[in-house]
Amino acid sequence: MSVKFEISFAKTVRLNGGLAILLKDADSESPAGAAGADPANVFAKAARIARFTAKGLSSLDIVAPEGSPVDRIIVIGTGRAKELNAHDWLKLGGAAAARIRNVEKAAIFIDLPGVQAGGKAAADFALGMLLRAYSFDTYKTKKGDDDDKNGAQKPVKVTIVTPDVAAAKKLFAASEAIADGVILARDLVNEPPNVLGPVEFAAKAKALEKLGVEVEILTEREMRRLGMGALLGVAQGSVRPPRLVIMQWKGGKAKEKPVAFIGKGVVFDTGGISIKPAAGMEDMKGDMGGAAAVTGLMHTLAARGAKVNAIGVIGLVENMPDGNAQRPGDIVTSMSGQTIEIINTDAEGRLVLCDALWYTNDRFKPQFMINLATLTGAILVALGNLQAGLFSNDDQLANQLTAAGLVTNERLWRMPLGKDYDKMIDSKFADMKNTGGRYAGSITAAQFLKRFVQETPWAHLDIAGTAMGSTLDEINQSWGSGFGVRLLDELVRENYES
């Protein structure tokens, strides 16, 4: 079971048993807080024996001797502390969280000698702890060692010692909102597909109303009235009805244009008639990672009271093979009026997105549109699971996204767009076809979407490699990563809040 933390901040802490976690700069002799937590200086001998050099994220676990103010001391190396950035502080928090087990309380000393760890560092450290503590264990029936008889997790009381308590508390309120948004996105991706269909997903988004988000849910009938033939074509093979969810957060000025985020929400993707291989198909419960990220982002923006008008639109469908399913060779008419020849029913995400993009642009006239989608396997071939693909018709927006990715370490790599690629999706029988063939697959998918954004600044993030099954690290031990929530929150915070 996952560990839960009750985190507080203090300038000093009275030590009386429990765990002390001390950060150690590779360039200093003693760890932070050593004078109070380790008066006997047992660290010096332990470090010498273990050849501990305080390399970044390395650790030394010490049982405190009789008479010590704490029961146990864990020293975590920071490397050269003067070089730490915001993401490094997140990772240190995650490393600390991973080592807190079987204790009721922990004091964490982060104010390194010669490197003042102010409120921002403390809040980032705490955010890293919250992100690392997450695990998806809803369907596990066996209790962990730290659980009570009812299976409830006993929270560990954590005090982070920092010289700037007021700033840490203020910034941590926003950090908690970010953590909650990421965790919501992770939960949605991790849920089994028999539990989370389009209707159930829409209900999860509807719950954001308690935070002040306005939520509308369009049914199949309403989408048909709007002419969303591309989205509805994907859904027609499933007994589960599709939904289009519109979330509005009005935190900016009354007449200020909103920023808009659109997510692909294929709650399960068999591939349809162009069916996928059986091996690994269970992972297609995560094919709604884009919609999950948008929902998590809207939670974060509302929970922290972001001073921006933001729109989140998610298209929710299930792609199933059935006697009524869409066929290769079908031609559908999108909301834009453009016709699409279906070449491969497994290239369905772009069909969902094209109607959602057109609807968003037509109704809200946003400053920009950013869509997120687990869209192509081709982006995995190109970038692996370390970076998401970025496609954009606007250099300023692309640069802002790239910069936000560097801050949050949710990194993006810009991919090309161009007329020669666009020609690859021309059709003999319709305005376009839904796949351009084997080569340049992630690019032709982006070119397809570009046909539905008109002149609005737009970016497409292909997160197929980063939303699920990505490399585990200090702040994520989950299959569903929640990729995109922190990235887009940073984008909004730095560039678009009034």
UniProtKB/Swiss-Prot annotation:
This is Probable cytosol aminopeptidase. GO terms for cellular component: cytoplasm. InterPro entries: Leucine_aapep/pepB, Macro_dom-like, Peptidase_M17_C, Peptidase_M17_leu_NH2_pept, Peptidase_M17_N. Keywords: Aminopeptidase, Cytoplasm, Hydrolase, Manganese, Metal-binding, Protease. It comes from Rhizobium rhizogenes (strain K84 / ATCC BAA-868). Binds 2 manganese ions per subunit. Mn(2+) 1 binds at D269, D346, E348. Its main location: cytoplasm.
